[in-house]
Amino acid sequence: MLKIEELEEELKKDEINSLYLFYGEEKFLLENSLKKIKKSFGELINGINYITIDENNVENIISDLETPAFGFEKKLIIAKNTKLFSKDNKKGKSENLALKEKINKYIEQNIEMLRKCVVLIFVEETVEKCSLLQTIEKEGVVCNFEYQKASQIQKRLKAIFDAYGVKIENNMIIYLIECCGTNMQELINESRKLIEYAGKGGIVDKQTIDKLCIKKVESVIFDLTDSLGKKDTREAIDVLRNLILAKEPVQKIMITLYNHFKKLYLTKVALNLKKDVASSLNLKPNQVFLVNKYKMQTQKFSEQELRKIIQQLEDLDYQYKIGLIDLEVGFESILCAYCS
C-alpha cells in the first residue's frame, strides 16, 4: 500500500507503474494523480491508446488488454467503478466472482507482457479483500486516497501560496480551512482567489480571507454560537440573517445548528467523563482539527444550557412541521430567549 505523498513523488519523477488500484474519498487528489499519468502519455487517442471501462463493459477488459496500441508504445486503460472489488454488482454473485477470477488469472499470467505495453488503472469507491486485490498489491500499486488531515492540507496549501510568492502565516491557513472546509478542490479554488488578489509578494491575512472567501454554513454556525456564548443577541441575529440573505435554505440552517449544538453537548459530556472527544463525535481524520474549537465553545455553555437549546430546536422543528411557526421567527426567538 502506497501513501498518497509517496505516489505523488513517484509520478513527479515520471515513474509510472503498469498496474494501479486507486480508491477512497479524497477525489481531488485521486483525479490529480490520474491527470499526471495521462499527461505522461502525451497524445491519447480514444479507442487506440486510451480505453475507458466501467461496470457495464468490464467483461471486455481482457480483449482490450490484448489489443495492441497501434502506432503507440503503450496503452492506458482506466477501469472506473467496475465493482470488481465489492459485493455490490449488477451481475449475479457467481458471475461476478467468475469474471473477477478470470481477470485476476489473466493479470497473473501476463504481468510481464502488461508491463511492456499497458498501464491499467482500476478506480473504485471502496474495495474489499479478494484475490485480484492481492495480485495488484503484489505486482502493482494500491493507493487509498483517504481524506487528508488538517496538517497535510495545511502543508499542501502553503506549498501553493509559496509557489506563487504569496505570503500567508500558518495560523491563517488554519483559519482558511476552518472557514471553507476540508474539500481540496474548494480550498484550492479559494486559494486561487486569494493569490490573484494579493499578487506576488503580497500578504494574505484574516481580513483578506473574510473579504474574498465563501464561508461554509458550518463555519458560520461557529460564529453564531460564539455570539450566543457572549450573549450578544444583535450579533447572533445578524449572523443568522446574513446566512438567510446568502440563500442558505432555512431547513439546512436548522439541521446544521441542531447538529452543532448536539456535538457541543457530546463534547461537554466526553470532557466530563475524560473520554476522547474526536472518537466521541465520530470525526473523520480531516475533521479532527475541529476538536479544539468545540472544546473552546463548550466553555461558554453549561451542560444544562446545551440540553435546553437542543430541546428548543427539536420543539421548533415540530412546530414548524405542523405549521405553527415560521422557522426564521423561531430561530430569532430562541436566540433572544437564550441571550436574555
PLM segments and residue spans:
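Short helix-adjacent coil turns
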Residues: 216, 224, 228-235
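Non-catalytic interfacial helical region
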Residues: 1-8, 12-13, 17-20, 27-223, ...
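Short helix-to-loop capping/linker segments positioned immediately adjacent to catalytic or ligand/cofactor-binding
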Residues: 165, 224-225, 241-244
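Hydrophobic/aromatic-lined pockets within catalytic cores
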Residues: 199, 229, 244
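Helix-rich C-terminal "collar"/helical-bundle subdomain used as an assembly and partner-interaction module
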Residues: 1-5, 12-23, 67, 74, ...
